[in-house]
Design a protein with these regions (language model features):
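Aromatic-rich surface patch/π-platform used for binding flat ligands and interfaces
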Residues: 1-171
C-alpha cells in the first residue's frame, strides 16, 4: 500500500493550474509529482488489472472503517490524468489511454461497493476520467487512431461491467 501524501491534492491543483496558465515550470512540476507518487500509480495499475478488484469494507470498525475517501481517490485519478498527459506529450497514445482506463476501472470497482456514497465516488471518478480529461483538457483529439480504438474497446468493456450500461455501441 503506497504511503499517503496529505498535501497531494494541493500539489495536484497547483500543477493543473500551472498547465492552464502555460507556466514554463509546469512540466517540471508534473515530472516531480509523477516520480514522487510512482508507487501510487503502480498500485492503481495493478488494481485495475485484477479480475476481482473491490474495496474491502470492515463493518466491525463502524461506518468509517476503511471506506474509500473521496479526496484520496480524486487525487489518485488526477495523478493518473497527469501521467496520461505526460505520455501524450511523449507521443505514447496507448500508454496515455491505459492510464485513463486504469482511472475508469477504479471508478467502476467502487460502483460495486454496497455503500451509496462510495458508489457516487465511483461515478465521479469515471466522469473525471472521461469528460474532464478527454474533453475539457483536450486529450481526445491528441490520441492516435490506435489509441482511440483502445479507448473505445476499454470503455465498452468497462461499460459491460455496470448494471445499467452508460454507453450504446452500434455495429
Amino acid at each position: 500500500s503506497p504511503k499517503r501524501n496529505p498535501r497531494l491534492a494541493t500539489e495536484l491543483a497547483r500543477c493543473f493550474k500551472a498547465f492552464e496558465s502555460e507556466n514554463p515550470s509546469a512540466r517540471q512540476e508534473r515530472r516531480r509529482l509523477l516520480l514522487a507518487n510512482k508507487a501510487s500509480l503502480d498500485a492503481l495499475a495493478q488494481g485495475a488489472r485484477c479480475a476481482d478488484a473491490s474495496f474491502r469494507l470492515e463493518w466491525e470498525r463502524g461506518f468509517s472503517g476503511r471506506l474509500p475517501m473521496m479526496l484520496e481517490h480524486h487525487s489518485l485519478v488526477r495523478l493518473g490524468i497527469l501521467a496520461a498527459q505526460s505520455a501524450l506529450d511523449h507521443g505514447d497514445s496507448e500508454r496515455a489511454v491505459q492510464h485513463l482506463l486504469d482511472n475508469a476501472q477504479l471508478g467502476c470497482d467502487l460502483l460495486h461497493t454496497p455503500v451509496g456514497m462510495v458508489s457516487l465516488t465511483g461515478c465521479l471518478l469515471i466522469s473525471i476520467t472521461t469528460f474532464e480529461a478527454l474533453v475539457e483538457q483536450g486529450m481526445l483529439p491528441r490520441l492516435s487512431p490506435e489509441g482511440l480504438r483502445m479507448l473505445a474497446d476499454g470503455l465498452y468493456r468497462l461499460d459491460s461491467e455496470l448494471q445499467r450500461p452508460l454507453l450504446v455501441r452500434e455495429g
